[in-house]
From Swiss-Prot:
Protein name, entry field: Rho GTPase-activating protein syd-1
C2 domain boundaries: 598-722
InterPro entries noted in UniProt: C2_dom, C2_domain_sf, PDZ, PDZ_sf, Rho-GAP_regulator, Rho_GTPase_activation_prot, RhoGAP_dom
Cell compartment(s), UniProt: Synapse
Organs and tissues of expression: Expressed in the nerve ring of embryos. In L1 larvae, expression is seen in the ventral processes of ventral cord motor neurons. In adults, expression is seen along the dorsal and ventral nerve cords, the HSNL motor neuron and more specifically localizes to the axonal processes.
Disruption phenotype: Worms exhibit an irregular shape and fail to show axonic polarization. Uncoordinated movement and retention of eggs, an egg-laying defect are apparent.
Gene Ontology MF terms in the entry: GTPase activator activity; Roundabout binding; signaling receptor binding; small GTPase binding
Compositional bias segments (type: Polar residues): 269-286, 427-438, 479-497
Gene giving rise to this polypeptide: syd-1
GO biological process, any: axo-dendritic transport
Length: 987
């Protein structure tokens, strides 16, 4: 009884498309999802997740036919043949010892095995709960010599089937399922067949040699030894000549100093006799666990022997120098960030232009800069200790009474402790993919005061790059000409978890390490009163030095509204970006200051700006959600969520559904036309086809504050904090009216969008463009009472796919609801067509005439006003006039359903007035007569254009039916009637 009820419920789901093909009113269709997880066409066998679209979204280059989310996949879902369904049900209702024994959960066994040479044919029985996932991934072909057939790709995480040993393994081919041949079926059909029955009989085939090869290869991967590779990393001379530290850190009083003293003691004992050295080299536990060293050609590097007495003597002298105290020999430069392919290391061997043929070592992090005894003879004595060079080479530091080195040329002092151990001049200089959240230098005026931030989202996180320094590292501004750049930064911990600055450096040592430096011994390239800003490195530029003090809020606000501000420093050589005024005062959107900030924005007086809202096109790309959680009451019902975007409390866009297996990666883009927008809200809802959707998370973003740093024309990535928990990664961009309505011509002459109307209708031999006519007719065919029409935005990805097909085949493109279920995609294409015309449908000259007509129109004489407006419209070019009549008739039809779609004349005019009137016609503006009291035509004034369009719509006649033969306006709006263009006179 339970099995038959489940089968009926499943049949109802698959036949109805999860509750019907139409979404609830006011909600666009969710995006389409393919049933493939990887490029190898893997497929998960979780039927519930598959039916509720839990797999990866459709690629932008997929065919248009896959945009229909309400239909089952081709060949699957509700289109399984009845014969196949009967075979599945017959085997499912058969008797089995596993079902009779009452085993709960998933169970599997091998019923028969028939070896045929290298191939083995097995009959496998699997008993599972209805709808239970097998945790199995399928693919088409084996990835080697076959491209057809259904093969097991891999097991999922915590797969129950993987615990049954030799029943089924990756690489096996599935021949039949419940006596149904599946070799020539699609992966979607196979997944559906596996999800329906409770009892499965699978006939599989595998190769013994291939299965053994797969098992052995996986075992070898799990037992990989630790190997340290040499990596060549070429660096510029400017980097190698720049000092790491003019005052090296003294670690005598820390755990690092203790370890260095232990190392020194061991080395002194090792020099007493060769027997002790040999014994120490063979019995030291460090040697047993030390990583094997290989060079760039994968050849092992042997440990050289130290047998010469000269080397022993030199090493003994080096280790026993009276001036070589522990506080000096334990000086270790702070760690640096290596490339992304190797571990983070401390560099000890980067002498510029110096190469040595002596073998190189890798030392543990706790070791000192004392070199081994066998290579001391091959280098000068001054190069062994950079602190004991001649005064001719090193400047004298009057503050410390010692010689300071600004350019370390010692080939031993840049030796890597883990991975890259070649000189820096031989390594690659490609460090563009490193973390941007490691400690950087800043002048420390007070005592120890490290501010740890956890609200900075690194760009590398969005790119999928891992950086262990991005977890807990303070922010310091770095000089642009030093080795401590944005790409090469230091790590405060030694790699062990839980260590902080207090465990590594004392207070004096940390101030010495993080303090200012100078190539001449005291200061760096910036004097004590100057520094480089970390915000200036956002665009990879190097700006002029500027002060560290933030100017008054009034001065900054005046500079934003256009008041001249005298520069306090010479202008930079590099041309400033739009955010130069903020860079000049070291203003960052992620403020790290102790001064109190206003809640209005990131240290900026937004009230003094010249704009208070945004009007233009808002580009919103919803990337993914992090830390999202479905409420406890909803966990048993659904695991899918979608995001809703509101602008000024108005519903404007909605994403498709996504699951936790997809890590809630929506990755959908929307182009939203906004008028005086100030706030955008993001709501995350749980989705279920039958139950009410529940609000799970919400967040808000003030648009003006998001774009004020880039002066309103740029895009940024935000990690928006949601309530009660989680983050939403969004990229938001904005283009103002000047950038949107440039009215440029499409260079593709055979295209449809962005082509002159006269050229387009002449080529198509039609009165109106084919694309515009078909799109309007399709919307009217579906009904103009759709809530959210022309307000909700369709997905940009779907819109691009449909637009590409219309460009290539305007007449043959399928626009029915079965192919394009989202009406918002079609509505957005209509607006794009009008927006991208090289010239507006209503030119500025005609607009000026309409303004004069509005000034002399009589309030109660509709017929006279209509006659006047139609005479003005007749002055347009024939192609523009016919297209305008088509659009105005459509808008009049839309207004007839205003109680249902919520579009009032004012709201509809704000949407379409910019599309019909706006342009950048600043060369020959229309000037009205001197006697008129009307103002001049403003080509980008949305209020003026909206009032003109409202006047036209208020007197526009209703659509007439050409079959009636009457020229009188119809009393009702005819949706299916043929358009009869009204033209009462000619100019």
């Amino acid at each position: 009884m339970l099995i038959s009820t489940s089968l009926k419920f499943l049949t109802m789901l698959t036949s109805n498309g999860f509750g019907g093909t139409n979404p609830p009113k006011g909600m666009p269709y969710p995006p389409t999802y393919l049933y493939t997880e990887e490029p190898q066409n893997e497929c998960c066998c979780c039927w519930l997740c598959r039916l509720l679209c839990c797999c990866s979204p459709v690629d932008q280059t997929a065919s248009r036919s896959r945009m229909n989310a309400s239909q089952p996949p081709p060949g699957g879902g509700g289109r399984l043949p009845d014969e196949v369904f009967r075979k599945i049900t017959a085997v499912d209702q058969g008797q089995s010892t596993l079902t009779q024994s009452g085993i709960q959960g998933l169970s599997a066994r091998t019923l028969s095995s028939e070896p045929r040479g290298d191939l083995v044919f097995q009959l496998v029985e699997i008993i599972k709960k209805p709808g239970q996932s097998l945790g199995l991934y399928l693919r088409e072909g084996n990835g080697k010599d076959r491209s057809d057939g259904v093969f097991v790709s891999r097991f999922g995480d915590n797969s129950e089937l993987a615990k049954y040993g030799e029943v089924m393994r990756p690489g096996d081919e599935i021949l039949t399922i419940n006596n149904v041949e599946v070799s020539m079926m699609s992966i979607d059909d196979v997944v559906l067949i596996l999800s329906i029955p409770r009892r499965l009989l699978l006939r599989i085939r595998y190769s013994k040699s291939m299965r053994h090869e797969i098992i052995s290869s996986r075992s070898r991967e799990s037992e990989r030894p630790v190997v340290v590779f040499h990596k060549y990393d070429d660096r510029r001379d400017s980097e190698t000549n720049a000092p790491i530290l003019s005052q090296p850190t003294s670690t005598a009083n820390t755990w690092l100093g203790k370890k260095s003293r232990q190392q020194m003691e061991e080395m002194r004992n090792a020099t007493t006799s060769s027997t002790l050295r040999t014994h120490a080299s063979t019995s030291s536990p460090r040697n047993h666990f030390a990583p094997r060293l290989v060079n760039g050609h994968s050849h092992s590097i042997g440990v050289p022997s130290a047998s010469t007495t000269s080397h022993d003597h030199q090493y003994q002298r080096f280790a026993s120098e009276p001036s070589d105290s522990v506080s000096r020999t334990a000086r270790v430069p702070p760690p640096r960030l290596a490339s992304a392919t190797v571990r983070r290391t401390e560099s000890f061997n980067s002498a510029p232009g110096v190469s040595t043929s002596a073998p190189m070592y890798t030392l543990p992090r706790s070791s000192t800069a004392v070199p081994p005894p066998d290579i001391l003879g091959s280098i000068p004595y001054s190069a062994r200790d950079p602190l004991m060079r001649s005064s001719a080479d090193l400047p004298y530091d009057p503050m410390t009474g010692r010689l300071s080195s600004s350019v370390p040329t010692d080939p031993l002092l840049s030796r890597s402790l883990c991975s890259p151990i070649l000189p820096r001049t031989l390594r690659q200089a490609n460090d563009s993919n490193k973390s941007n959240s490691l400690p950087r230098r800043r002048i420390m005026t007070g005592g120890r005061n490290v501010k740890w931030r956890n609200d900075v989202v690194s760009t590398s996180d969005l790119c999928g790059e891992e950086s262990d320094g991005a977890i807990s590292a303070p922010e310091y501004s770095s000089p642009p000409f030093s080795r401590l750049t944005q790409q090469q930064q230091f790590r405060l911990s030694n790699g062990s978890p839980g260590r902080t600055v207090n465990d590594i450096f004392s207070a004096a040592e940390y101030r010495n390490w993080a303090g200012p430096y100078d190539p001449r011994g005291m200061y760096g390239p910036f004097p004590p009163g100057q520094r480089a800003t970390r915000w200036s490195h956002t665009y990879g530029e190097q700006r002029a030095p500027r002060t560290s003090s933030l100017p008054g809020r009034t001065v900054l606000a005046q500079s934003l509204v256009g008041s001249p501000v005298l520069p306090r420093h010479p202008p930079p050589i590099v041309q400033d970006r739009p955010s130069a005024v903020f860079d000049r005062y070291h203003v960052s959107p992620l403020m790290n200051r102790r001064a109190p900030l206003r809640a209005a924005g990131p240290g900026i007086n937004v009230d003094r700006l010249s704009v208070s809202s945004l009007t233009g096109i808002l580009y919103v790309h919803i990337v993914e959600g992090r830390g999202l959680k479905i409420p406890e009451k909803q966990k048993g019902l659904t695991e899918e969520m979608y995001c809703v975007l509101e602008v000024d409390e108005q519903h404007r866009a909605r994403t498709g559904v996504s699951t936790i297996e997809q890590k809630f990666k929506w990755r959908e883009t929307f182009h939203i036309d906004v008028v005086n927008a100030t706030v955008s809200n993001f709501f995350v809802y749980s989705w279920h086809p039958q139950f009410r959707h529940k609000l799970c998370h919400k967040g808000s973003l003030k648009l003006l504050e998001a774009f004020v740093v880039d002066q309103l024309n740029d895009d940024r990535v935000f990690a928006l904090n949601l309530e009660p928990r989680g983050q939403l990664i969004v990229r938001i961009g904005f283009h103002d009216l000047q950038a949107v309505f440039r009215r440029t011509v499409n260079p593709r002459l055979n295209g449809v969008f962005g082509i002159s109307l006269s050229r387009l209708v002449q080529r198509e031999r039609r009165d109106t463009p084919i694309v515009l006519t078909r799109l309007i007719q399709e919307i009217e065919k579906r009904g103009v009472d759709y809530s959210g029409l022309y307000v909700l935005c369709g997905s940009v990805e779907k819109k691009k796919m449909l637009r590409a097909e219309l460009e290539s085949n305007p007449l043959g493109t399928e626009l029915a609801a079965e192919s394009i279920p989202d009406t918002n995609v079609i509505a957005c294409l209509i607006k794009d067509f009008l927006r991208e015309l090289p010239e507006p449908l209503i030119s500025p000259q005609i607009h000026g005439m309409l303004l004069e007509a509005a000034s002399v129109a009589l309030p109660n004489d509709v017929q006279t006003n209509r006659h006047l407006v139609l005479k003005i419209i007749d002055c347009l070019q024939l192609s523009a006039k016919n297209c305008l009549l088509l659009v105005l008739d459509h808008l009049s039809t839309v207004l007839c359903s205003s109680p249902h779609n919520g579009l009032t004349p004012t709201r509809l005019s704000l949407i379409f007035a910019p599309l019909l009137f706006f342009c950048l016609d600043t060369f020959s503006p229309y000037t009205i007569s001197p006697t008129s009291k009307m103002a001049a035509v403003r080509t980008l004034d949305i209020n003026q254009a909206s009032s003109s369009l409202q006047m036209i719509l208020s007197i526009w006649p209703s659509r007439v039916n050409s079959e009636s033969g009457s020229d009188s306006p119809a009393t009702t709006c005819q949706k299916g009637g043929v358009i009869a263009y009204v033209s009462e006179s000619q100019c």
